[in-house]
Amino acid sequence: MNQKKAVILLSGGLDSATVVAMAKADGYACYTMSFDYGQRHRAELQAAERVARQLGAIEHKVIGLDLNGMGGSALTDDSIAVPEAPSQGIPVTYVPARNTVFLSLALGWAEVLEARDIFIGVNAVDYSGYPDCRPEFVEAFERMANLATKAGVEGNGFRIQAPLQYLSKAQIIQAGVARGVDYGLTVSCYQADDQGRACGKCDSCRLRADGFAAAGIPDPTPYF
């Protein structure tokens, strides 16, 4: 019997690394996909390569996109500052339609690979309030995937799996540690330096640090 395949979105951060480990533990052959989309730094792409290697991905693919050509986000437009204090509403670090774009490309690769499962590390508990991290979005994308693909209309449906959806950051970290994730390889910071060191001030850094503290696990994050 052939091993079931999964395409997994891997940013190089804590959440997506955990998802790779969870999929592997569930018996999937893992095909990881990252995006060089014009983000502020390349440290997360280097982290994604390290994580894919450590967790035994069958293939790690990096797709080039020019989302900074559109701008509209502090992560793709250097003229918009990354906030270093909590904010109300959807923060300026939201990248317009990013998860829709990423999942669409993962869907295409999954169809080529004849993989039925696509994993994404979105979370609706300890998160920044992005609309494309909500359960409603994941469910809607799965419906679209099965309407928009040859595989879907022929009855070989896709599943969009978001195993972290209802977990706290501490629970995510505990799940990853139990499955052998080396979080020292990951980068979560929105404005990490060239060595992957974190600022310790942005929303992503705060969520990460609070998660390690709540989990009672030492935080391996290097800071500048």
UniProtKB/Swiss-Prot annotation:
Keywords: ATP-binding, Ligase, Metal-binding, Nucleotide-binding, Queuosine biosynthesis, Zinc. Its EC number is 6.3.4.20. ATP binds at L10, S11, G12, G13, L14, D15, S16, A17, T18, V19, V20. InterPro entries: QueC (IPR018317), Rossmann-like_a/b/a_fold (IPR014729). CDD domains: QueC-like (cd01995). Catalyzes the ATP-dependent conversion of 7-carboxy-7-deazaguanine (CDG) to 7-cyano-7-deazaguanine (preQ(0)). This is 7-cyano-7-deazaguanine synthase. The gene is queC.
